[in-house]
């Protein structure tokens, strides 16, 4: 029985990517598309939805930096 190759679309450009060792940047087709996606997350163009809005000051206290 021959196993089928799983194919996915690159989330950045839509090009078909074979899911396997021959595609080291999977699910992306290349390093460029991977870096474009990383940049979108870094610029906060993409984010995981949340019910609450936290700011940096809500999480960290300058009074006791070792507390967290």
Curated annotation (Swiss-Prot):
Renumbered residue ranges of the record's region Disordered: 45-68
Any Gene Ontology biological process: regulation of DNA-templated transcription
GO molecular function: DNA topoisomerase type II (double strand cut, ATP-hydrolyzing) inhibitor activity; zinc ion binding
Entry binding sites for Zn(2+): 10, 13, 29, 33
SUPFAM superfamilies listed in its UniProt record: Glucocorticoid receptor-like (DNA-binding domain)
Listed cofactors: Zn(2+)
Keywords (A to Z) from UniProt: Metal-binding, Zinc
Entry note: cofactor: Binds 1 zinc ion.
InterPro entries, per the entry: DNA_gyrase_inhibitor_YacG, Znf_NHR/GATA
Keyword Nuclease included in the entry's annotation: no
Pfam family, one: YacG
Start-end of Acidic residues biased regions: 53-68
Biological function: Inhibits all the catalytic activities of DNA gyrase by preventing its interaction with DNA. Acts by binding directly to the C-terminal domain of GyrB, which probably disrupts DNA binding by the gyrase.
Similarity annotation: Belongs to the DNA gyrase inhibitor YacG family.
Entries under NCBIfam families matching the protein: PRK00418.1
Assembly and binders: Interacts with GyrB.
Protein known as: DNA gyrase inhibitor YacG
Organism: Yersinia pestis
